[in-house]
Every structure is written in structure tokens, then in C-alpha cells.
């Protein structure tokens, strides 16, 4: 598919956003809080934007402030001439965005190595490309099987998640760009400890489990078919299990998608991110576990959130990059084989802004 564009500049470990400058109003502080949540919860961008831009009832106070008290009426005077209305600043045209979300069992020193583009002993356990179309009317999550056999730029062929081990976030980004023939604008890595903590900060998440199973590690948690309320540890067991299934990693990816959709639904519900305290708790809980590329600044987050203000809350479609089944590499590894024709079709849909048509044509509206 040709050479992929250079990935974003070197990554950096995330840190809590700086306090607003003196004199900043309550709305600015609220914006910073919600944009911090957007950083952590890239898959919930539509819900965050909804909360950010939802109109406040007339007469209500800004977040964190009280309604001003009435003051005694002054003596009648001639009203001043009205000031001329300011000329509105035109909104820049929106463009499609691709954000790579990585779930990794990384430690603090390994996250720093990944941010710097250094080799480490970590691999991405979950890879999801978040695609936000230019019209901002939906959000797509494309799961990539971690054992997919691909070209790693400069390193030959290997499992796709080896990009993180061999060259940190920059090489992982470049690898997915080469695979899909699509530029990735930003990359976010969340470790699994942060994933569990975020779930607990939300009060748990209700997930509709389609296939009953019992975990094969740790406490061997049982997940009956139907709606399960998952706390952090149970959620972690749910999204990481693969040995309990006949099709292994394929069902694990489906479970990851089900959890992400359930989390989006909770965030989009009334009260999910509407409470400032809830948002702050999410940010302070999860930010120590997040690594992002250096270009994912507060300004870029603000631009993204503003452009998403008309996105219907909770609109998300999750599916898996098509593959050609499983096989064995020359050195004996169990791998997932690429489906070149299907990957090319998806790449063309991403590049032409026709992903909605691709999803409809392949009946992926409810995932796969």
C-alpha cells in the first residue's frame, strides 16, 4: 500500500492538565476537565462532546459557581447605546481523524520507554483504531487482532503487536499506518491497571455477555450469559480472557468491543459525565496510567471536542479488521493471517470517507 506517513512526533507520558490561568472562568475550567476525560476515554468522544456543549438552562449557574444574588435597583438612567455585535469567527472545516488506542500491561518505566520509541518487553494486548469521520456523525472502532502477521517497518514480519516492543508508540503507529494505508493522527496507550481503576471510578459497567464462560486464570471468574455488572477486576478478566473460547482471540476481541460499547452507553447516559466531580475522579484516577503522542495537546483536544458538539451521544460502531483465519509462521508461532482484499477494501473506505457505506455493505452495524 506504499509507504505510510510518518507517525506523530515522539510520544510523552501523560500528566494532569495544568491549572487554568488566573482569572479563567468556570466554563474554561469545566472545559479542561472534560477534555482531560476525552484524552483518557477516546472511545467515548461523542458522549464527552455532548456533555461539553449541552446548553445550560436560562438562569442556571456555571459549573462550580452560584447564581449571582440580586442587587438593589439603581436610579433610572438613560440606557447606553448597544455595542455592535462581534463578527463571528468561522469554524474551520472538519477533517476525518484516526486515533490508535492501545491497551497494554505496561509498567511506569516501560511506558516511558514506549513514549521515547525505545525497545521494551511490552506488547499491545488490545489494538483499536478509532475513526471519527469528517461529518462527526458517528465514531467507529476497528479492532486489530494482536497476532495478525504483518510487516513491521525496518524489522521484517512479525505479529502486529510486536511494533510496541520493538520501537514503542512511534513504531506501533507506523506499523498500523502501513497495514491500513491510513494516517494516524494520535496514539493513546492505557495500561490495564488504569483500565480497572477507570471502571471502578465509573461505579462499574453493565455488559451483555453473549457467551457464558469461566475465566482460566486468577480467581476463575464465571460470567453467565446476560447482563453482568463488572467492577474493575472483573472487567479486566472479561476483556483479557481467550483460553476459555474455541476461537480464542476472536471472542476476546468481541468481548472487548462489547465492553467498550457498554462503557460508551454509560458515559452517554444522564449523569455519566455531567457531574464535574465524576469527571475529575476519572481524570485523576486514570491519567497516571496513560501515555499519548506529543501532538495530542490540550489545544488539539479542544478543537476535537468543539468539532464533536453535534455528534449524537452514544453513536459508535465496533468491528474487527477481517482476516483469513489462523496459521503458523515459519518459526512455529501461531498467527492470524491477513485478508489482503478485505484490508484493501477497508483502507479504501477509510481514505475516501466511505466507512459508513463499507459498514452497511458488510452488515457490521452491530459489530462482528
Could you say what each language-model-derived stretch is?
Residues 2-368:
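Non-catalytic, solvent-exposed segments at the cell envelope interface
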Amino acid at each position: 500500500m506504499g509507504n505510510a506517513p510518518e507517525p506523530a512526533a515522539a510520544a510523552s507520558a501523560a500528566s494532569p492538565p495544568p491549572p487554568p490561568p488566573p482569572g479563567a472562568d468556570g466554563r474554561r475550567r469545566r472545559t479542561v476537565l472534560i477534555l482531560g476525560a476525552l484524552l483518557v476515554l477516546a472511545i467515548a468522544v461523542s458522549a464527552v462532546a455532548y456533555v461539553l456543549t449541552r446548553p445550560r438552562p436560562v438562569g442556571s449557574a456555571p459549573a462550580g459557581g452560584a447564581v449571582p444574588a440580586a442587587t438593589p435597583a439603581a436610579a433610572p438612567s438613560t440606557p447606553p447605546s448597544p455595542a455592535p455585535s462581534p463578527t463571528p469567527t468561522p469554524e474551520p472545516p472538519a477533517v476525518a481523524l484516526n486515533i490508535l488506542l492501545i491497551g497494554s500491561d505496561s509498567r511506569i518505566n516501560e511506558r516511558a520507554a514506549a513514549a521515547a520509541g525505545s525497545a521494551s518487553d511490552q506488547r499491545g494486548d488490545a489494538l483499536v483504531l478509532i475513526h471519527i469521520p469528517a461529518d462527526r456523525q458517528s465514531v467507529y472502532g476497528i479492532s486489530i487482532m494482536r497476532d495478525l502477521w504483518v510487516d513491521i517497518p525496518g524489522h521484517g514480519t512479525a505479529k502486529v503487536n510486536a511494533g510496541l516492543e520493538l520501537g514503542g508508540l512511534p513504531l506501533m503507529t507506523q506499523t498500523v499506518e502501513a497495514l491500513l494505508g491510513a494516517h494516524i493522527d494520535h496514539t493513546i496507550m492505557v495500561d490495564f491497571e488504569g483500565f480497572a481503576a477507570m471502571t471502578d471510578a465509573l461505579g462499574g459497567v453493565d455488559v451483555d455477555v453473549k457467551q457464558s464462560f469461566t475465566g482460566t486464570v486468577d480467581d476463575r471468574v464465571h460470567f453467565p450469559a446476560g447482563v453482568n455488572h463488572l467492577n474493575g477486576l472483573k472487567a479486566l478478566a472479561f476483556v483479557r480472557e481467550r483460553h476459555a473460547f474455541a476461537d480464542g482471540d476472536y471472542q476476546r476481541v468481541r468481548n472487548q468491543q462489547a465492553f467498550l460499547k457498554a462503557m460508551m452507553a454509560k458515559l452517554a447516559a444522564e449523569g455519566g459525565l455531567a457531574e464535574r466531580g465524576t469527571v475529575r475522579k476519572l481524570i485523576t484516577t486514570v491519567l497516571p496510567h496513560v501515555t499519548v503522542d506529543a501532538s495530542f495537546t490540550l489545544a488539539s483536544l479542544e478543537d476535537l471536542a468543539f468539532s464533536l458538539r453535534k455528534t449524537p451521544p452514544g453513536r459508535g460502531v465496533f468491528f474487527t479488521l477481517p482476516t483469513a483465519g489462523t496459521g503458523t509462521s515459519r518459526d512455529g508461532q501461531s498467527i492470524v493471517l491477513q485478508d489482503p482484499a478485505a484490508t484493501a477494501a477497508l483502507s479504501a473506505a477509510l481514505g475516501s470517507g466511505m466507512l459508513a457505506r463499507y459498514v452497511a455493505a458488510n452488515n457490521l452495524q452491530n459489530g462482528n
